[in-house]
Amino acid sequence: MSRVKSGKVTHARHRKVIKAAKGYYAARSTNFRTATQAVDKANQYATRDRKARKRNFRALWIQRINAAVRLFDLEMTYSRFINGLAKAGIEVDRKVLADLAVHEPEAFNAIAARAKAALA
C-alpha cells in the first residue's frame, strides 16, 4: 500500500491561515502556529463585537431620542415618550425615531406631540 502524503493540502491550509493573518505584526503574520492563534483570537473578537455593535447602536438611538424628547418638552422623559407612543398606537422603531430626531426634527416633534396627547 502506498504512503499517503498531504503536502498540497497542508500547504493550502497554511496559506489560508497566513493570508487571513496578513497585516499582523511580526511572527503573527508569517509563522503558522502564532498566525493560527492570532486569527482564532481575531475571530473571537469579531464574533463578540458583532453582538456588542447591536447593543451599542440601540443605546445610541435611545440617547438621541431622549435628548430630542427633552428638547421638545422638559417634563417628558424617554420612558414616558415610549409609553405615549404605545398608547397612541404609533409603531415606529428606535432606529427610525433617532434618525427623525437628528434629520427631521419637525416630524419628530409631531410624533412627540401625539405621544404627549396620548398620555394626557
From Swiss-Prot:
A single BP term in Gene Ontology: translation
Record carries keyword rRNA processing: no
Pfam families named in the record: Ribosomal_L20 (PF00453)
Keywords of the record: Ribonucleoprotein, Ribosomal protein, RNA-binding, rRNA-binding
InterPro entries on file: Ribosomal_bL20 (IPR005813), RIBOSOMAL_L20_CS (IPR049946), Ribosomal_protein_bL20_C (IPR035566)
Signal peptide: none
GO MF annotation list: rRNA binding; structural constituent of ribosome
GO cellular component, one term: ribosome
Similarity-based family: Belongs to the bacterial ribosomal protein bL20 family.
Role summary: Binds directly to 23S ribosomal RNA and is necessary for the in vitro assembly process of the 50S ribosomal subunit. It is not involved in the protein synthesizing functions of that subunit.
Name of the featured protein: Large ribosomal subunit protein bL20
Organism: Cereibacter sphaeroides (strain ATCC 17025 / ATH 2.4.3)
Underlying gene: rplT
